[in-house]
Curated annotation (Swiss-Prot):
Its EC number is 2.7.11.1. The lineage of its organism: Eukaryota, Metazoa, Chordata, Craniata, Vertebrata. It comes from Xenopus tropicalis. The active site is at D149 (proton acceptor). Autophosphorylated on Thr-183. GO terms for cellular component: cytoplasm; nucleus. The record marks D326, V327 as: Cleavage. Keywords: ATP-binding, Coiled coil, Cytoplasm, Kinase, Nucleotide-binding, Nucleus, Phosphoprotein, Serine/threonine-protein kinase, Transferase. SMART domains: S_TKc. Residues 431-478 form the SARAH domain. Pfam families: Mst1_SARAH (PF11629), Pkinase (PF00069). This is Serine/threonine-protein kinase 4. It is found in: Cytoplasm; Nucleus. It is an enzyme of class 2 (transferase).
Length: 485
């Protein structure tokens, strides 16, 4: 109803907060209606602008958060005026919080829609979303801005089905004197190879991320999602470009579009303007085909809320978050027979860390910033330099107690060391000794492999940095010397 009223009376449509409104307390200007979730750096709320009744989104950020990054986000949003970029209306300081007032997108993020419907997107739906997203990227890149965190969680739909780019917490400005940036920033699984390798990158890094996002929309998760993010960071630059798990399910145009986005050499990668002319995008249907997605997601969210209110008993409340994290089975919608169930896969809700609705989920898919010389401490996802020893599962302790209680049978081979650091690769490559180990011992060793790998990766990273830093310092020293002359 509000949308119709605003359309019939365009003078009452909020474009920007007036100076008078900005000088008032935010509660005098807005009615906060409900919490929507968690965004980068703070909580996001749905609110109503009292003067126009327009619904807006308000991001509330604690002042102790990284103000430099927040100011950068505001500055980038202020400079943007595009139908396909979330609009900025103004900001307030309230007690210890900064309130950023932005355009409200009632459809939610694409990842929210996939999660709530428990179903991936069809090919024509993906094409329509990609078309709007490319228009937003074309605008940003024309303004010499890189988003640097393109993924389904950062593409929002309004109630009409228009896709808009959101969450500029890690976006960067490209200047003439800094044609390529050298900071590793973004979300690991969506990162372009040149971003990971720190060899300098420009706007087409967003195009790689868009290609990964297209796979995410079609299959429910990005490539490498099943493996540890730190391992993915090593695999993305060294492996061939990813593609669909089953390319035969998709049209040739869609597969070709993905291939053009995921070109490892950034100089050969297509731009947003070029991709808008691709047959897969040019034949995309209108935004109206996305409205049923929005309605189905909102219905699912409402049912989920009602079910939660009915079923959660007081003694179960502490386990409610764990129950919500199980989103069941997701149906993958193929392209050749849209009415046939093509494939089932389990979707992990942790894949979307941009906005977690109400329930706080632990995730390993967060936005990552590594080795930024100017913004060294600003990353959302920090690297842990100390190796974490795995907690021993309770079932292992149970079996060990039983073995101690009744005595362990004699073994033909020595008992394996419980210290992972002592586990060596056999020189002859013969692992036949493993057949004499108990299930408990094998499970313990298996559970310790990932922490061992992370520790080794961290050590390699430190060695690389130790070699790299003197070279950077020498280059900087020579530049200063040249300037003095």
């Amino acid at each position: 109803m509000e949308t119709v009223q605003l359309r019939n009376n365009p003078r009452r449509h909020l474009k920007k907060l007036s100076e008078e409104s900005l000088n008032k307390q935010p509660e005098e200007v807005f009615d906060v209606l409900e919490k929507l979730g968690e965004g980068s750096y703070g909580s996001v709320y749905k609110a109503s602008h009292k003067e126009t009744s327009q619904i807006v989104a308000i991001k509330q950020i604690p002042v102790e958060s990284d103000l430099q990054e927040i100011i950068k986000e505001i500055a980038i949003m202020q400079q943007c005026d595009s139908l396909h970029v979330v609009k900025y209306y103004g900001s307030y300081f309230k007690n210890t919080d900064l309130w950023i007032v932005m355009e409200f997108c009632g459809g939610g993020s694409i990842s929210d829609i996939i999660r709530l419907r428990k179903q991936t997107l069809k090919e024509d739906e993906t094409a329509t979303i990609l078309q709007s997203t490319l228009k937003g990227l074309e605008y940003l890149h024309f303004m010499r801005k890189i988003h640097r965190d393109i993924k389904a969680g950062n593409i929002l739909l309004n109630s009409e089905g228009t896709a808009k780019l959101a969450d500029f917490g890690v976006a960067g400005q490209l200047t003439d004197t800094m044609a390529k940036r050298n900071t590793v920033i973004g979300t690991p699984f969506w990162m372009a190879p040149e971003v990971i390798q720190e060899i300098g990158y420009n706007c087409v890094a967003d195009i790689w991320s868009l290609g990964i996002t297209a796979i995410e929309m079609a299959e429910g998760k990005p490539p490498y999602a099943e493996i540890h993010p730190m391992r993915a960071i090593f695999m993305i630059p060294s492996n061939p470009p990813p593609t669909f798990r089953k390319p035969e399910l998709w049209s040739k145009d869609f597969v070709d579009f993905i291939n053009l986005c995921l070109v490892k050499n950034p100089e050969l990668r297509s731009s947003a303007t070029e991709l808008l002319q691709h047959p897969f995008i040019k034949t995309a249907k209108g935004e109206s085909i996305l409205r049923h997605l929005i309605n189905e997601a909102q219905d699912a969210k409402l049912k989920r809320t009602e079910l939660k209110q009915r079923e959660v008993e007081p003694e179960e409340e502490e386990n409610a978050d764990e129950d919500e994290a199980d989103v069941g089975t997701m149906v993958q919608a193929g392209s050749k027979d849209l009415n046939t169930m093509k494939e089932f896969s389990t979707m992990n809700e942790a894949a979307d860390c941009t906005m977690v609705e109400k329930d706080k989920l632990n995730t390993q898919m967060g936005t990552m910033l590594i080795n930024d010389e100017d913004e060294e401490e600003t990353g959302t996802m920090k690297q842990c330099t100390e190796p974490v020893q795995p907690a021993k599962p309770s079932f292992l302790e149970y079996f060990e107690q039983k073995e101690n209680q009744f005595g362990t049978p004699e073994k033909t081979t020595p008992a394996p060391s419980t210290d992972p650091s002592e586990w060596k690769i056999p020189l002859n490559g013969d692992y036949s000794f493993l057949k004499d180990w108990s299930v408990t011992e094998l499970q313990l060793r298996l559970n310790s492999l990932d922490p061992m790998m992370e520790q080794e990766i961290e050590e390699i990273h430190h060695k690389y940095q130790a070699k790299r830093q003197p070279i950077l310092e020498a280059i900087e020293s020579k530049k200063r010397r040249q300037q003095n002359f």
